[in-house]
């Protein structure tokens, strides 16, 4: 879905394409922010940037990477970001996708493992922050071998976003192991409940392994 909105291989209106239009093109839009019941059709719409419970999907982070990397106090969220769109499961792609608005991204595979680097081409036309792909670097059998050798804590992806040579954003992903707990978290965007009898808040239940990695 994120690739469809960003820059698919087929001919379709996409974010990258809108940025390549002439200056005479005054604007463009894609689709809905949330999954929802269509009303006119029995099948739900699943093209939202968030699901029906307002939990972000990969496409949310792809669009988040299009914001400027500078901090702005006038915005709810701003500044540099980096996000690894990979679950590290036996069925995950060997290619690893990363979204970031930083000038440079370093991706480290496992403790003391190989590091890969991406540098943004500032002369490229199109969307501000293209989707970053590190091809063929995930190998589930390496995870399996390290886990059997009791080194499962050393299996991870670590992405570092750099601006002017300095690390300004990080994101770490580890494979989820055996489910061991249910974790509850309040999704209130930092806004407290109002005790007037009419307010409510979303509580998200997540199944995680013993280290808190979501299954």
Predicted regions mapped to residue ranges:
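Low-complexity, acidic Ser/Thr/Pro/Gly-rich terminal tails and inter-domain linkers that flank the onset
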Residues: 176-196
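Ordered hydrophobic segments in well-structured contexts
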Residues: 81-83, 97, 158, 172, ...
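Short beta-turn/strand-loop junction motif enriched in small, turn-promoting residues
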Residues: 15, 191, 209-212
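Active/binding-pocket-proximal capping segment
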Residues: 113-117, 176-179, 215
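Beta-strand-rich structural segments
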Residues: 98-100, 199-214
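Edge beta-strands of extracellular beta-sandwich domains
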Residues: 165-177
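Extended substrate-binding grooves/exosites of carbohydrate-active enzymes
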Residues: 1-166
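Short, solvent-exposed loop/linker segments at the N-terminal edge
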Residues: 86-92, 190-201
């Amino acid at each position: 879905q994120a690739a469809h909105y960003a820059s698919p291989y087929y001919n379709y209106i996409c974010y990258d394409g809108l940025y390549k239009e002439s200056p005479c093109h005054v604007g463009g839009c894609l689709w809905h922010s949330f999954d929802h019941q269509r009303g006119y059709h029995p099948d739900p719409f699943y093209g939202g940037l968030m699901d029906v419970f307002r939990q972000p999907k990969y496409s949310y982070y792809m669009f988040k990477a299009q914001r400027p990397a500078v901090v702005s106090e006038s915005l709810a969220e701003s500044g540099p970001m980096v996000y690894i769109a990979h679950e590290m499961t036996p069925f995950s792609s060997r290619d690893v996708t990363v979204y970031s608005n930083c000038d440079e991204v370093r991706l480290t595979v496992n403790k003391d493992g190989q590091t890969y680097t991406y540098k943004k081409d500032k002369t490229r036309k199109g969307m501000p922050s293209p989707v970053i792909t590190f091809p063929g670097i995930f190998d589930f059998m390496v995870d399996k071998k390290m886990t059997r050798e009791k080194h499962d804590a050393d299996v991870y992806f670590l992405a570092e976003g750099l601006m002017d040579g300095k690390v300004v954003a990080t994101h770490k992903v580890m494979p989820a192991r055996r489910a061991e707990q249910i974790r509850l978290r309040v999704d209130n965007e930092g806004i407290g409940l109002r005790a007037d009898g009419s307010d409510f808040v979303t509580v998200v239940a997540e199944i995680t392994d013993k280290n808190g990695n979501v299954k």
